[in-house]
């Protein structure tokens, strides 16, 4: 399931809602060179038209949200969860925060709200995120989500037209798809056996 009819998610300070074409101008205005330098697929410059095209392109394959401050509706950033093209049981999360609103924990709060929704609506078993080795802010978000490191790999970065070393973290769904009758935090009997041999964990 993509983000069609995706209802807003509310947290104590934020509202996450489906990105719309009408958000393109505001999102493009927030994207900066400093933010783009930390992202794999957001090359500068960003125009309203280009942002609208991104929204249309990504909506069918996942959940893409603008992040607004609940108190005043100010747009502070973006968070998404997209199915990976190589594995339908896996999704990749990404996020960015406008420079003027960094340092307040907004992305950590937004990502934590989106993660369980991504598992439920996308029906995936694993959610991952990756970042440059020195992107400590993103790794702090990943740890807060309960993600654990799974190692590094070189990935193609369209924003800079090259392959870069990226460190990945991931988290597995607490229970397999189809076992939603279990109480939250309760594992299926076969869960531990299924995990044997697995390595410990954009």
Feature names for model-found ranges:
Residues 35-55:
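Conserved GNAT-fold acetyl-CoA-binding loop/helix
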Residues 55-66:
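A short helix-loop-beta-strand connector motif used in the catalytic cores of GNAT acetyltransferases and
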Residues 50-51, 59, 141, 164:
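A generic membrane alpha-helix/interface feature
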Residues 44, 48, 60, 80, ...:
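Intrinsic disorder/low-complexity segments enriched in polar/charged and small flexible residues
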Residues 1-39, 64-202:
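Acyl-donor (CoA/ACP) binding surface of acyl/acetyltransferases
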């Amino acid at each position: 399931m993509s983000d069609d009819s995706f209802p807003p998610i509310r947290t104590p300070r934020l509202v996450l809602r489906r990105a719309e074409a009408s958000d393109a101008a505001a999102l493009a205005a927030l994207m900066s060179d400093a933010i783009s330098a930390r992202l794999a697929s957001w090359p500068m410059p960003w125009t309203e038209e280009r942002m609208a095209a991104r929204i249309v392109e990504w909506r069918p394959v996942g959940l893409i949200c603008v992040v607004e401050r609940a108190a005043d509706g100010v747009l502070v950033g973006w968070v998404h969860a997209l199915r990976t093209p190589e594995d339908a049981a896996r999704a990749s999360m990404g996020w960015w925060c406008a420079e003027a609103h960094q340092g307040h924990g907004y992305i950590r709060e937004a990502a934590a709200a989106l993660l369980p929704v991504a598992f439920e609506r996308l029906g995936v078993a694993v959610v991952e995120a990756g970042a440059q080795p020195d992107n400590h802010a993103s790794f702090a978000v990943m740890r807060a989500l309960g993600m654990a490191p799974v190692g590094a790999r070189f990935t193609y970065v369209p924003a800079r037209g090259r392959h870069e070393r990226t460190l990945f973290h991931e988290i597995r769904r607490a229970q397999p798809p189809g076992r939603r009758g279990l109480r939250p935090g309760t594992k299926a009997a076969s869960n531990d056996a299924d995990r044997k041999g697995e390595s410990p964990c954009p």
